[in-house]
Amino acid sequence: TRWSHRSLVQWKELFSAVRQPLFHETGVLWLARHYGAREQLTVETLQRSGVTFSILDHAQLAASYAQINTENVDFAIFEPHSGVLLARRAVAAVVEDALRQGAEYRTAEIGPIRNAGAADDFKTTAGEIISAEHFVFACGSWLGKVFSEVLASLIFPTRQEVFFFATPPGDARFAAPAMPTWLFQEDQVYGMPDLESRGFKIAFDQHGPIVDPDTQSRFASPEAAEQARSYVARRFPALRNSPIVESRVCQYENTSSGDFLVDRHPEHKNVWLVGGGSGHGFKHGPAMGEYVAGQILGEVPAEPRFSLASKETTQRRAVY
């Protein structure tokens, strides 16, 4: 929570500096069947972190969001200042800003580490030698393939499918500000309002099957599409007959617990392995960058949950 809050401040600073409005303050609505232990911990964490939020009961929720079928939902948290980062364009903005500040950006495939101990350099498959004092590898779902000898059984890349539904012409109920970004806790489903006329987004947060990110099909499956249609019809009745106008297939990249991985390569102490971002690593990017830099420079204590030693070969998801 602290990292998310800190990162949003830095994302906004970047977007202001590059003059690109890549954050939509839609608000985020967290929905749950009832107020239990997990909900209490969430409220306490938000309070400690100074995050602005309000609590809604069933009646308040139904009155505020009549377009949502709130059956069996008796508790909700609304964060008015949260929202949606436009990921692809934000990454491009980071690269452009880094170039302006003197960084180099290259697209290349590296070969294996060529020597024991500290890695002095890496050779790309094109024959270029890249030398540095420290190397950081944040390869997402490909991290387990790039360092298969260490991470093949510790990184779990799963198939995740996303769908966008058309909204009725002239109907603003499914666009911000009438519709916030939302998440149903027990259903493990989340979505976003219609942004930039792309449609109403829905995705399932359950982990899909383990896949190879290089070879998995990028076409959405009929089964997942039908699951999305069924859910939308139940929770958002006005979209019951709306067509799917776009679909995407991507990956989550999890460790056994769902915690991040930030640690040295066990055989090459100047090579850092950074991963386990799941579906939320991007939004934590600024805080993660600060932490990794602090680790390399020896300026911040290591978080035990991020260590390589804490990762197991069997998934026991604890972080969502």
Where in this protein do the model-derived segments appear?
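Helical element adjacent to the flavin cofactor pocket in flavoenzyme catalytic cores
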Residues: 78-126, 130-134
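Dinucleotide-binding Rossmann-like beta1-alpha1 core, especially the glycine-rich loop
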Residues: 1-64, 73, 188
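Active-site substrate-recognition segment that forms the wall
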Residues: 13, 19-24, 134, 141-270
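C-terminal catalytic lobe of FAD-dependent flavoproteins
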Residues: 231-320
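Glycine-rich, N-terminal phosphate-binding loop of Rossmann-like dinucleotide-binding domains
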Residues: 33, 139-140
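Short loop/edge segments at beta-strand edges and connector loops
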Residues: 57-58, 106-109, 246
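A short, glycine/Asx- and small/polar-enriched loop/turn
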Residues: 38, 67-73, 114-121, 254-258, ...
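Short beta-strand to alpha-helix junction loop
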Residues: 2, 30-38, 77-96, 217-224, ...
